[in-house]
Swiss-Prot record:
The keyword ATP-binding applies. Pathway: Protein modification; protein ubiquitination. It comes from African swine fever virus (isolate Warthog/Namibia/Wart80/1980). Belongs to the ubiquitin-conjugating enzyme family. It catalyses: S-ubiquitinyl-[E1 ubiquitin-activating enzyme]-L-cysteine + [E2 ubiquitin-conjugating enzyme]-L-cysteine = [E1 ubiquitin-activating enzyme]-L-cysteine + S-ubiquitinyl-[E2 ubiquitin-conjugating enzyme]-L-cysteine. Pfam families: UQ_con. SMART domains: UBCc. Residues 1-160 form the UBC core domain. Binds Mn2+ ion which is required for highest activity. Can also utilize Mg2+ ions. One of its GO terms (cellular component) is host cell nucleus. It is found in: Host cytoplasm; Host nucleus; Virion. Its EC number is 2.3.2.23. This is Ubiquitin-conjugating enzyme E2.
Length: 221
């Protein structure tokens, strides 16, 4: 069942490509996706192409997927091993933070929420203590260089680890479709949550139509 849901979502994303992320699927396991997230414009992460893996549990969509960065990240809410601390994907204190997982969530919404998190860290719920301390010093104007320097280092490293094809993909996507401004990611996520689409399976629909036609022919006879 889970693979049927994911196939429908995958098909939706392929038919509606985004300039903000790129997805690919493990042909042998539909529950494992590779994604590349483009750093939001007008932020320290601008220009970066950050790789991550998305793993879907057997209970999906009734349980959230797990996203883990494989690119090195410097961010208060991303663990050193790449695991992500975000309420939309984890149940811990989700209600207090105002966001809970819902089966109506779409992969688009999840990925845009992660991109939004890059520009809006929550240092009060740190996954990387050192990054959180550095970010607080930046916010308090105690150290204006350390945090930006580390982020820019990871941006450069992410590009070094990307293939020319991936870089070209985003270059073409950005030139063809205007990027979402950094302060609009949250609004975009909210709109997408309201605009849920119905998962359909063409083959099954066609089979049902054929069966109905056969029944009608038998009744006529």
């Amino acid at each position: 069942m889970v693979s049927r849901f994911l196939m429908a979502e995958y098909r939706h994303l392929i038919e509606n490509p985004s300039e903000n992320f790129k997805i690919s699927v493990n042909e042998n396991d539909m529950t494992e996706w590779d994604v590349i997230l483009r750093g939001p414009p007008d932020t320290l992460y601008e220009g970066g192409l950050f790789k991550a893996k998305v793993a879907f549990p057997p209970e999906y969509p009734y349980a959230p997927p797990r996203l883990t960065f494989t690119s090195e990240m410097w961010h208060p809410n991303i663990y050193p091993d790449g695991k992500l601390c975000i309420s939309i994907l984890h149940g811990d204190n989700a209600e207090e933070q105002g966001m809970t997982w819902s089966p109506a969530q779409k992969i688009d919404t999840i990925l845009l929420s992660v991109i939004s998190l890059l520009n809006e860290p929550n240092p009060d719920s740190p996954a990387n203590v050192d990054a959180a301390k550095s970010y607080r010093k930046l916010m308090h104007k105690e150290d204006l260089e350390s945090y930006p320097m580390e982020v820019k280092r990871t941006v450069k490293k992410s590009l070094d680890e990307c293939s020319p094809e991936d870089i070209e993909y985003f270059k073409n996507a950005v030139s063809n479709v205007p990027a979402i401004p950094s302060d609009a990611y949250e609004d975009e996520c909210e709109e997408m949550e309201d605009d849920t689409y119905i998962l359909t399976y063409d083959d099954e629909d066609e089979e049902e139509e054929d069966e109905e036609e056969e029944d009608e022919e038998m009744d006529d006879e």
